[in-house]
Amino acid sequence: MTLIKSISGIRGTIGGPATENLTPLDIVKFTTAYVRFIAESAPGKRLKIVVGRDARISGEMVGDIIEGTLLGCGADVVNVGLCTTPGTELAVTAHRADGGIIITASLGLLGVLLNAFVPKNAFEIVM
């Protein structure tokens, strides 16, 4: 599956050729861009970002990359672990976080991943 980038996130297959799939480097780049975007609305503030995921095999690995990148960018991370998309969105509000990242599969296919980037005032992002 070709890497798909949209306003609400990224979608791609884990594994395979780097130019055609979602790679760890892609995950780092998109996570870093998200932190920079959120930081623009809160200059000088230490950000708090919620991370949630579904039970797909690749979700834990992707979550580890995202969490490490967020920490490397100076953000605090609230890892809610296995959690539904609405549950992760609610956790952003409950933890008074600045945003959230949801790691979930699309269409139920193994290896296909969507990272939805959630600003704190968002309702629900659907792709």
Regions found by a protein language model. Name each.
Residues 2, 13, 111-127:
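Gly/Ser/Thr-enriched, mixed-charge loops and adjacent short helices
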Residues 8, 35, 91-95, 102, ...:
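Short alpha-helical interface elements
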Residues 43-119:
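Ferredoxin-reductase
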Residues 1-68, 72-73:
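An N-terminal, well-structured beta->alpha segment
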Residues 23, 84, 124-127:
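General structural signal for secondary-structure boundaries
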